[in-house]
């Protein structure tokens, strides 16, 4: 063979092969699904390229994948007449993994085989799955549009290296031959191979054929029998497609091992004509938070595959949705640039977004347990929605779930509709608090009065929550109110103050002035409050000022953070406040005020500028 060379696998490939062979062995038959799926993709790519270059078909436009086996040689071969590969493409696709974040993904793998199996399945094993059942894999391929002597040979035993060389191949496409390991004879059984193809590949539009041999008049006659329906699943009516077929098709397009949570199959006619098949996965992809994570729908135009990962049809906060759209209105030569500026795309995006939100609303209504699975996997992503999509903000708000003082659990199970249904008579606002953790939110002194009054508070502790709430201003006509803000509605909740208490407060006015003078412009204001029951003091911000949590978000993003000026609120009924007010010695008075302020700031921010000074001051006051 000409141009033969032996090359080493990229280190990640070696690691993936090892993990895959051991983790996926219990579900080893999926290798055939993966290889047929790749062949289907190769046919799709050829059809697309041939739209502008019909000569790529080379007079052979009947695309198919063929499966054959040789019991004597113990080989199984999967051959297609799709797009094929050049030498450079073979090295890129079969010698390396081009996915960003692969190294981090592999490092995250543990020793739990069931968990590893799910993770690797999520990653998408594709071609490498052949090594689950084969101890050697041989590939012969010729790219469409090149001469017969520009074909490529690739071979590996799945260890540390592979061989690549130039060969001659008359027909276009890729032929993969698996040299089966000892003990894998089931894949040389005609009935077994047929049943696997029927199970996993019935929905593929590409005909999958199996070799049949018949002895006639002393001659062996070879023919090819189509095994699958070979009709694009989404073109069939919903009543014709079983749940198992929908699930199998999802696994084909998503390269996922797990069943989807739900799906929606719709054909729309009228002003715009299109078919959509949208799926909600049951688990998040391993690289969902990776900047380079590819997402979007498969795009077909008049049943011709155009592109993968067409992100223009789904907003970013729904990037977990998998599926396809088949449009009759877009041109066959559509590009990503044309999609970006097309009014057809914008209309389709709007319709598909509404479809997904309706699908999720139905899931939440019909199966709370499944919806909770969805929320645990994708809730953080959905929380990006109120900021990104003001047109659908109300629909998104219905889908949000929160922890709450009502459930006394960190689990985010409470909907806004649940909250509103439990609002007290005369309660006009939906109260919430944001914090760094559920524990910090739950124990915040800002909740004291509301707990006493039996008023529910939503406990928000995800990093995105403060940002989300800056866009989400009301639900069902009820305004949202942060309990960490200085708001009249919170003061009004306090019991009516009797005359003697009013007189006591009046007597504390000089004390409040002393505190103001001492603290100067370090705080925005000093005042007495009736919002507290057990805590001597808190700090709050005005409704129109940046909150503590938002300031933390800015800082984490490396942005300049404007100074937050707090309102210092003191509980006139607390013994520490009374003791401070009675202190005449100015030095002692200063220490007590500083201690109260530090306590309030620490409760609000979780940190202090000078914690050592705080400890020194507290120790000194404890022994004085």
Swiss-Prot record:
It is found in: Cytoplasm. GO terms for cellular component: cytoplasm. Pfam families: HATPase_c_3 (PF13589), HSP90 (PF00183). Residues 553-624 are annotated as: C. GO terms for molecular function: ATP binding; ATP hydrolysis activity; ATP-dependent protein folding chaperone; unfolded protein binding. InterPro entries: HATPase_C_sf, Heat_shock_protein_90_CS, HSP90_C, Hsp90_fam, Hsp90_N, Ribosomal_Su5_D2-typ_SF. Keywords: ATP-binding, Chaperone, Cytoplasm, Nucleotide-binding, Stress response. Homodimer. This is Chaperone protein HtpG.
